[in-house]
């Protein structure tokens, strides 16, 4: 019984470590710009850098839920709130400010 509990704890710890702690450096990698005028491309890049490890490169899910049709369930403001405050195992504030707004808008369009 102790080994099952230890294995479960280790698995959950590894999953949470994979999802969090990326820092707020999405804009730093390209001189503070997230793709110029193309907001959708910039949002997708921010997502891939900060969220894809849990939600999948194609939004199909994994450790985190499937987001392929998240816009049919949540509005942009609701998605932005989830990004800011976290939900379930998702840590709060992985993406902040304008980057969070871009990603929320991009995800809200996924219907």
UniProtKB/Swiss-Prot annotation:
GO terms for cellular component: plasma membrane. Gene3D superfamilies: Cytochrome c-like domain (1.10.760.10). Heme c binds at residues 51, 54-55, 90. It is found in: Cell membrane. The keyword Manganese does not apply. Residues 1-18 form the signal peptide. A lipid is attached at residue 19 (N-palmitoyl cysteine). Its main location: membrane. Binds 1 heme c group covalently per subunit. A lipid is attached at residue 19 (S-diacylglycerol cysteine). It holds the Pfam family Cytochrome_CBB3. It is a lipid-anchor. Appears to mediate electron flow from the cytochrome b6f complex to an alternative terminal oxidase. NCBIfam families: cytochro_C551. This is Cytochrome c-551. It comes from Bacillus sp. (strain PS3). The gene is cccA.
């Amino acid at each position: 019984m102790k080994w099952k509990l230890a294995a479960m704890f280790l698995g959950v710890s590894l999953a949470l470590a994979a999802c969090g702690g990326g820092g707020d450096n999405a804009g730093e990698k390209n001189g503070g710009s997230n793709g110029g005028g193309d907001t959708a491309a910039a949002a997708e890049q921010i997502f891939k850098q900060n969220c894809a490890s849990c939600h999948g490169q194609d939004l199909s899910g994994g450790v985190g839920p499937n987001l392929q049709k998240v816009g049919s369930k949540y509005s942009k403001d609701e998605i932005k709130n989830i990004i800011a405050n976290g939900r379930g195992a998702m840590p709060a504030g992985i993406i902040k400010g304008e980057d969070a707004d871009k990603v929320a808008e991009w995800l809200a369009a996924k219907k």
